[in-house]
UniProtKB/Swiss-Prot annotation:
The gene is zapD. Cell division factor that enhances FtsZ-ring assembly. Directly interacts with FtsZ and promotes bundling of FtsZ protofilaments, with a reduction in FtsZ GTPase activity. The keyword Cell cycle applies. Interacts with FtsZ. The lineage of its organism: Bacteria, Pseudomonadati, Pseudomonadota, Betaproteobacteria, Neisseriales. One of its GO terms (biological process) is FtsZ-dependent cytokinesis. The keyword Cytoplasm applies. Keywords: Cell cycle, Cell division, Cytoplasm, Septation. Belongs to the ZapD family. This is Cell division protein ZapD. Gene3D superfamilies: YacF-like, YacF-like domains.
Length: 252
């Protein structure tokens, strides 16, 4: 099976982008080659731009508090594992405290580092980080992998509270999902929403099918069509075959 996730709200879209970028950051930092650590720096710069919204911190804190209140209401529910519930509540409390401790604009530690900002500026130019353009950067790349890794972790540390918050919220959101099995007749599927709005939609189907799902959703209807995934075509075409798939609606 292959699964695709589609954010329905802007908040969910930001959470998924943060998760994607932090995942890449962890991967490249864990590697040893200078090229990998160059990629890690580029991800840091992407994170700085992605999470620079002034209201991101407030949004995350608001959603964490809302989830905390909803979960606290389950404490006396005999169908809920108390130990698991308390563990999640502790994670939420820890993530909230770390976010509250953040001061200044997100990524300010990076913006105030002139050396890093020089690399960021040159990285936007094709081939702009050659050694003759940035000799001090070339020198840094020649240091041991562990020294570079420590630097990267130090630069990334002030950003990590948003990673923890995004991870917790996406975990709770995905766990809320309800899965249904459907068939898209001749590659098309429509479902009336009845005014119900979800935050995340997952579509899963046989990974042997050379198809891609295209989705549009609002509070009135959900439309999915499966199109050809063959590269080189001018325009993807909707398949003529019936497609069995799983649809998961996730909502806090």
């Amino acid at each position: 099976m292959i699964s695709f996730e589609f954010p329905v709200t802007e908040r969910t879209r930001i959470l998924l982008r943060l998760e994607y970028l932090y995942g890449r950051l962890a991967y490249f930092i864990g590697k040893d080659h200078p090229h990998d650590h160059h990629a890690a720096l580029q991800v840091l710069f992407e994170l700085m731009e992605t999470a620079s919204r002034a209201d991101l911190k407030a949004d995350l804190l608001q959603e964490l508090e809302r989830q905390k209140q909803m979960l606290e209401a389950l404490r006396d529910n005999p169908n809920v594992a108390e130990e698991t519930l308390e563990g999640v509540l502790e994670e939420i409390e820890r993530a909230s405290s770390q976010l509250l401790a953040l001061t200044g604009k997100f990524g300010q530690n990076l913006r105030e580092n002139e050396w890093l900002m020089a690399i960021k500026q040159r990285a936007g130019i094709p081939g702009g980080t050659c050694q003759f353009d940035l000799p001090s950067y070339h020198l840094w790349q020649q240091r041991s992998a562990e020294v570079r890794r420590q630097d990267l972790r130090r630069w990334a540390a002030p950003l990590m509270p948003t990673a923890d918050a995004a991870e917790i919220l996406l975990h709770l959101l995905r766990d809320s999902g309800k899965t249904y099995h459907y068939v898209a007749r001749k590659g098309a599927f429509q479902q009336m929403s009845g005014g119900k709005v979800v935050q995340l939609i997952q579509v899963a189907y046989d990974d042997n099918l050379e198809l891609l799902p295209e989705l549009s959703a609002n509070k009135y209807a959900l439309n999915i069509r499966f199109v050809s995934a063959v590269t080189g075509e001018a325009r993807p075409r909707q398949t003529e075959q019936d497609v069995e798939f799983q649809l998961t609606n996730c909502k806090f």
